[in-house]
């Protein structure tokens, strides 16, 4: 029971931090159920980036230096399962649900740079402001 209270306190602190960042200025928040936390704001673009399982496992192997595919798959499954459970606990919805997103992108098709460019273009179209133009210059 004590663990659940600690978890809820951490989640509450996370909600506060994400709202503080969003209130302060334009920002990019990766994960942390930010689509749910910022769901009542009009100035948010919710994007879910995904890739086929084999590409995600290959990324785990590269990033963590794991040479055994079975071990990399176990690592990926463990993290993926925890992320799904955490998101569902907080939101009551499945992670990656298209109904809470403006955009879903398979990053394996375009690669990271073109995926980023696509998101920047979407920001520009949705908000029609200079932040997207500045991001393009920095990319």
Specify the residue positions occupied by each region the protein language model found.
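C-terminal helical "lid" subdomain and adjoining coupling/linker elements of P-loop NTPases
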Residues: 126-139
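Small-molecule kinase domains that catalyze NTP-dependent phosphoryl transfer to phosphate-bearing small molecules
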Residues: 68-113
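Short, amphipathic alpha-helical "lid/cap" segments that border enzyme active or binding sites
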Residues: 15, 112-120
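ATP-dependent small-molecule kinase phosphotransfer cores
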Residues: 1-26
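Conserved nucleotide-binding/hydrolysis micro-motifs of P-loop NTPases
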Residues: 34-36, 51-56, 109-111
């Amino acid at each position: 029971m004590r663990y659940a209270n600690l978890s809820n306190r951490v989640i509450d602190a996370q909600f506060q931090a994400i709202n503080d960042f969003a209130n302060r200025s334009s920002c990019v928040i990766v994960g942390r159920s930010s689509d749910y936390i910022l769901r009542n704001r009009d100035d948010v673009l919710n994007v879910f980036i995904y890739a086929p399982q084999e590409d995600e496992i290959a990324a785990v192997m590269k990033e963590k230096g794991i040479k055994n595919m079975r071990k990399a798959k176990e690592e990926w499954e463990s993290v993926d399962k925890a992320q799904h459970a955490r998101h569902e606990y907080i939101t009551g919805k499945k992670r990656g649900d298209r109904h809470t997103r403006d955009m879903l992108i398979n990053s394996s098709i375009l690669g990271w740079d073109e995926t980023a460019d696509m998101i920047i273009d979407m920001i520009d179209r949705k908000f029609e402001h200079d932040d997207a133009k500045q991001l393009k210059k920095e990319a």
